[in-house]
Amino acid sequence: MKDFENDLIYYPNPDPVKEPRFILKSVDELEKSTKYSVTCNGTERVVYHTDSFDYVVVVDNEAYDLEISIHTPYEKLEIRPSSFGIVPSVKGETIHIHLDEPRKFTVETDGGLHDALFVLCSHRIEKPADTTICFEKGKVYNVGVLTLKSNDTVYIEEGAVVSGCVYADHCDNISIVGNGIINGSCWHLLDSNAYRFFIYAKWCNNVLLKGFTAVDGPSWHVVPAACDHVVIDDMNIY
């Protein structure tokens, strides 16, 4: 018989986390994968590690020539979803994949989903002219809770990491766009969920969420509650 309690990845009813548990001093403090390394079009990409999976964000406006090295032995390799028909070529510990357009897929070895690699390919998003909040490449921003107001446009540049949650209440015309990362791990204990929503907009009108990666949030990741005209486009939500 399956042991549901002991098989849980996250403990569903932890004590509330009332303040961010830690402050990141640089993007280098985020844990990196030891199992995978990835290059795209000859450029090495950062592969991050979470307690559930590894992931890499790949941004380009051209075709994607991917080299994925797997540094642990395996017998069976699967690329999912299988409906994409991605057939890699394999040479040693490196697999080669060519994509003519962005795809989001997983690399799984020996049926292991919990140590799979999520490959998240996207087109590059340029900085909007009306940007009011800009998070720049190569930097980490400890926002705690980023509270938006009407007409805010948040741009998260590729390579930027925003540590915290996002909240908007009764706002009009707000957007979060870019190719960077919002990481919510500071708002929950390891192996636990938490009571706080990750990206929470309530009673808002005209909301755009596009391109960025929302990972390791404390609870429900994207919650537009009682909002009108919400567009969620090409996000990576994990």
Q: Predicted segment positions?
A:
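Extracellular/periplasmic carbohydrate-active domains that bind, remodel
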Residues: 1-238
